[in-house]
UniProtKB/Swiss-Prot annotation:
Modification type N6-(pyridoxal phosphate)lysine: residues: 228
GO BP terms in the entry: L-histidine biosynthetic process
Organism of origin: Methanococcus aeolicus (strain ATCC BAA-1280 / DSM 17508 / OCM 812 / Nankai-3)
Reactions catalysed, as given in the entry: L-histidinol phosphate + 2-oxoglutarate = 3-(imidazol-4-yl)-2-oxopropyl phosphate + L-glutamate
Cross-referenced Pfam families: Aminotran_1_2
Similarity section: Belongs to the class-II pyridoxal-phosphate-dependent aminotransferase family. Histidinol-phosphate aminotransferase subfamily.
PANTHER family per record: HISTIDINOL-PHOSPHATE AMINOTRANSFERASE, HISTIDINOL-PHOSPHATE AMINOTRANSFERASE-RELATED
CDD domains (UniProt xref): AAT_like
Pathway participation: Amino-acid biosynthesis; L-histidine biosynthesis; L-histidine from 5-phospho-alpha-D-ribose 1-diphosphate: step 7/9
Cofactor(s) in the UniProt record: pyridoxal 5'-phosphate
Alphabetically ordered keywords of this record: Amino-acid biosynthesis, Aminotransferase, Histidine biosynthesis, Pyridoxal phosphate, Transferase
Domain of life of the source: Archaea
Protein name: Histidinol-phosphate aminotransferase
Amino acid sequence: MTIDNKIRHIVKEFKAYVPGKSKEEIARNYNINPDEIIKLGSNENPWGSSPKIKEEILKELPNIHQYPEPVNPILMEELSKFTNIPKENIVVGGDGADEIIDTMMRILIDKDDEVIIPIPTFTQYRISAKIYGANIKYAKFDKEKDFKLDVDSVLNNITDKTKIIFLCTPNNPTGNIIDKKDIEKIINSTDALVMIDHAYIEYSKEEYDLTEFALKYDNVLILRTFSKVFGLAGQRIGYGITSKKIVDYMMRVKPIFSITRLSQICAITALRDKEFFEKSKNDGIKSMEILYNGLKEFKELKVYPSEANYLLVEVKNGMSSGEFCVELLKRGVIVRDCKSFEGLDGEYVRVAIGTFEEDRRFLEILKEIVN
């Protein structure tokens, strides 16, 4: 007898998610000083988080033996002010925005229900859908049009069994945004939940705010996170903006104490530090411009415009994306090989923003490999 006989078949078919490489791993494998490694593989904030957070964490440490409040009223008030959305339309989750995704799966998905996922995009949508037994219908971001969303490929997949449509904008890993009118067209074509992932929206240079859709329609949920511009990826906290009806359903089934006391303190402090937020956002956009302009100089690479904190780069010098990444690793630079992104055929890597000095060093190192 063996426990293997009791494991769900879908779980047996899964391979464990492989995250971006850490500085510590590369330091060990390539005998490089960790302080000299340039990490551009995980879409993190290279400037860290608000300097005010450390002091607030120290104040909270005496209380960590106590359970956190499931709904922290101070955090909800700060989020409401930051988003200009009533707090009754906001739900906060631990584990970044992933908990929000998982909670909606619990609420909506029965076995053999359908979800629509335009690809290439964030892998977590597919993983969650499969775990809950959904059938995935793939739409597409059109490579021939710089990965613009093929709206018809979404609309043509909508059926009575469609429960969730995922729209990542700016899209990961391509960096482009989806036209607002196209999103509203999709919303008006279905009663399924349209989940709009806005993890990187603060880096967009365009006037692009879709929160009105979450108040106008009862089948829209907008995902936001503290992991990027706020620099709190290690605290794992995200939130959703949606109808009061959906908030009510989510509060019935989401984990009760998933947002730790320290995560709540970090989020509150980050929201209050407006100066850091603006500098982090503006420096991130400037870093993107440095990388984009620098990468365009290499004729052996094709770089795509981006409204996020990363760039999609096609390797066209005869190397595979894996070989390209290894050559960078040998020189202490981490970027993301995009082979794991379904629907992205070819040799692509994703390069996230660094500090201005890291950007400069990366572009210099790149000359050794590409040229």
